[in-house]
Amino acid sequence: MRRRLVVIAVALALVPGFSPAAAEEAVPPKLTWTRCGSTPESRLECASLRVPLDYRHPRGRAIELAISRLPAADPARRKGILLTNPGGPGGSGLGLPEQVPQLLASQPEALARYDVIGMDPRFIGKSTPVTCGLDGNELALPNWPGPGGFAATVTRARNVVRKCTDRAAWAMPYATTANTARDMDMIRAVLGEPKLSFLGYSYGSELGRAYVALFPRRVDRFVLDSNTNPLWTAREADLRFPPHFERMYGLFAAFAARDDAQYGLGTDARTARARVDGLIAEAGIAPIPSGDDDPYTALDIRSIVMRLLYAENRFHWLGRFVATLRARQPLPADIAFLGNLRRFTAPPGVPKDNFIAAHLLIKCGDEAYPRDIEQYRRDFEEGSARYPFLGPAMSGISPCAFWPVRPREPIPSVAGSRVGVLLINSTGDPATPYDGALATRRLMPRSRLVTVPVSHHAVLGEFPNACVERTAGAYLVSGDLPDRDVWCEP
């Protein structure tokens, strides 16, 4: 009981207009840490805390928040905590601290200074996970059309919303980026830290900005990699996705055409693309055998192709994947993991649709979508014609168009912020286009932008670059941003 009251006291300090005195006088609860690493040698520890479901009523219902910790490699020089987020929304981050030593492998000095903290954000993974009870094609993201075209996607979107309303209506009003940022500050407070450092990728940049907006005085060193655009509405972001992936599809086709001997897709880009499109069409008629009991449907292949178009250094995997399926052979052992990309999965004990359910609750909970179905139809037709790979999925309708709960608060804005953070982005990122980093840089004039002229989503530790790693490492160690923006050649 005492632990519950202490957490409430900390939560009250986060409510605008509430005096923080009670929280300052409270003693943070002692978390119970247990080993939870993926290997016996791992030093990763896990714990859980309770946070308010609704921060406007912090004495009301509480939910569980699962966190993890990789202790600082050099406790004597420990700087504080480095909270991490892999993106999403909907992504589990509990295991991410185990990967940070690889992401910052060239910067051991930075790694030595922090307890690296992971979290499953609210309603995700082991943090009071939500489910909509989705199955089959409902587990696909985005809303790919199939037989029945646009009308079928409308029906599917309505069915998804109906199921989410039946199973997760209790969570809908509280699944917001702002509340997740408040959870982040709860973690900081419970761990007894005066400030928070943060490493966030993709949607993690949105979380980082929300925290900066809500708690500017508690920001220490923030690294935001692959930045969403704070000036776009969610619908605008959907409509801007397809041209960037169309460009990546063209780059892949040209890549494959340069090595017809390995990939067998032809010696020119047009032929290479036609053969990939042909494979998807064949799978739409009859699933492609996979060597096990789970053949590849057209939806499976589209999903895998899309994920491998996120970064140009995945093109060789995509070429081999397509070549193997065209030959009706099982995937070789070294790329067998690609089969797992056909759909989002969940760890044991977590509902299989948790990623999709949480993604929708947060996306639809942050911002209202248009309700005009005919406008979605027009967008679908135009997107399908101009961007045939991803246009039909992203330009069409979203379940958010039928969401029963109107958003309670927007994502907090950093416009005019006096806080400086380190931004990282590639110029050709298809998922979080470079415009997002430039817009964030303008809104946060004290920040610095590190740019890499490649086509890659997620840079630090994902696209090897000594300049990026050195710049981020120096900032995490010293707290000093570069004097000016940094351009890092690949």
Feature-to-residue mapping (PLM):
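Conserved acidic catalytic loop of the alpha/beta-hydrolase fold
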Residues: 163-170, 181-195
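Conserved alpha/beta-hydrolase "acid-adjacent" motif
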Residues: 430-435
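Alpha/beta-hydrolase fold active-site neighborhood
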Residues: 273-418, 464
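Catalytic-loop region of hydrolases
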Residues: 2-7, 21-151, 181, 270-276, ...
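A catalytic-pocket lid/entrance helix-loop region that shapes and gates access to the active site
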Residues: 132-142, 212-275, 320-344
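Histidine-bearing beta->alpha loop at or near hydrolase active sites
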Residues: 453-460
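Short beta-strand/loop motif that positions the catalytic acidic residue
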Residues: 417, 423-425
